[in-house]
Amino acid sequence: MMESGDRQNNKIGIIGGSGLESIELFTVKDKVNCNTPYGKPSSSLINGTLNGIECVLLSRHGDSHDIMPTDVNYRANLYALKEAGCSIILATTACGSLQEELKPTDFVVIDQFIDRTTKRHSTFYDGQNVQMKGVCHIPMRNPFCEKLQNVLLSACNVNNVSCHSKGTMVTIEGPRFSTYAESNLFRKWGGSLINMTTVPEVVLANELGMLYAALAMVTDYDCWKEDHASVNVENVMKTMKVNRGNALKVLVSAVEIISKQNLQPDIQLAEKNAKNSVML
C-alpha cells in the first residue's frame, strides 16, 4: 500500500464535481500533467495555496466536463492525488434528492452509500500493479471520515448555508437518469440522495488510507416527486449556478478549519486499516 510517510504531506486534495471545475479558488503554483499505473487522471493537478494552505485541485469530469461518470478514471485520480502528497480529500458532487426535506440548493454531508454501479474498477488490487499485491477487503461500515464530515458541516454553518448532517447516497451507473420506478425503489431502500460518482471514489480513497468526505449539492428531486419537474440537464445546470457560489465559500472555510486541526493520528489509523485489509 502507498503510505503518506513516503512523501511530503498532508496536503488537502479537492475533487471538483459538476460546476466546480474552475481554479479560481487558488493562488496557483503550477499545473502538472501526470500519469499513474492506472492511466491518466481526469485532469491536470492544480497545485496551489488557499490562504497559504497547500491544496491540490482535480476536476473529476475533466477541464471541459467531457468525461461521463462511467469513464472517469477514479483509480488514477486518487492515486495521483496520493502521489502529490494528499492524505485528505474533500469532494463535491451534484445530486438529486430522494426525500422531501432535502430541497434543491440544500447541501448534505454524506455518511453512507448504496452502490448501484456496474462497469467501474472499484479496487486498486487487481493484480496489475506490483505495488498493490494481494486482495483488499476494505471495511465500509463508515466509508466517510467523521472528522471531515464535521468540518464540512461547520463550514456550512459559518457561511449560513443550509446543510443536512447526514444522508445515504445512491450511486447509479448513468449517464441516464433514473426511471420513476427506480427512483421510488431507492426511496424505499432508505436512499436520501442520488448521483453517479461517489462510488467507487470513496472506496478507492479508503484503500489508499486517505481521509475522505463529500459535500453533496442538491439540484433536483430526481423523478419521484409528482408535483415537481423531473430531473433534466437544463434545470440541473440552473441550480448548479446557485450552488456553486456557496460551495466555494464552504470549501474555503473547510480548508481553514482543517489547517487548525491535527489529523495526523487519523491519517495513520486510516493507513493502518487499509494495510491490514490486504490479504497476501
From Swiss-Prot:
Binding-site residues for phosphate, renumbered to this chain: 18, 60-61, 93-94, 197
Pathway(s) it belongs to: Amino-acid biosynthesis; L-methionine biosynthesis via salvage pathway; S-methyl-5-thio-alpha-D-ribose 1-phosphate from S-methyl-5'-thioadenosine (phosphorylase route): step 1/1
Residues the entry annotates as binding substrate: 196, 220-222
Taxonomic superkingdom: Eukaryota
Gene Ontology BP terms: L-methionine salvage from methylthioadenosine; purine ribonucleoside salvage
Record-linked InterPro entries: MTAP (IPR010044), Nucleoside_phosphorylase_d (IPR000845), Nucleoside_phosphorylase_sf (IPR035994), Purine_phosphorylase-2_CS (IPR018099)
Cellular component GO terms, alphabetical: cytosol; nucleus
Catalytic activity: S-methyl-5'-thioadenosine + phosphate = 5-(methylsulfanyl)-alpha-D-ribose 1-phosphate + adenine
Annotated keywords: Cytoplasm, Glycosyltransferase, Nucleus, Purine salvage, Transferase
Annotated site, Important for substrate specificity, chain positions: 178, 233
Annotated S-S bridges: none
Class in the EC hierarchy, top level: transferase
Enzyme Commission code: 2.4.2.28
Cellular compartments annotated: Cytoplasm; Nucleus
GO molecular function terms listed in the Swiss-Prot or TrEMBL record: S-methyl-5-thioadenosine phosphorylase activity
Residue intervals passing through the bilayer: none
Function statement: Catalyzes the reversible phosphorylation of S-methyl-5'-thioadenosine (MTA) to adenine and 5-methylthioribose-1-phosphate. Involved in the breakdown of MTA, a major by-product of polyamine biosynthesis. Responsible for the first step in the methionine salvage pathway after MTA has been generated from S-adenosylmethionine. Has broad substrate specificity with 6-aminopurine nucleosides as preferred substrates.
Family, similarity comment: Belongs to the PNP/MTAP phosphorylase family. MTAP subfamily.
Quaternary context: Homotrimer.
Name under which the protein is recorded: S-methyl-5'-thioadenosine phosphorylase
Source organism of this protein record: Ciona intestinalis
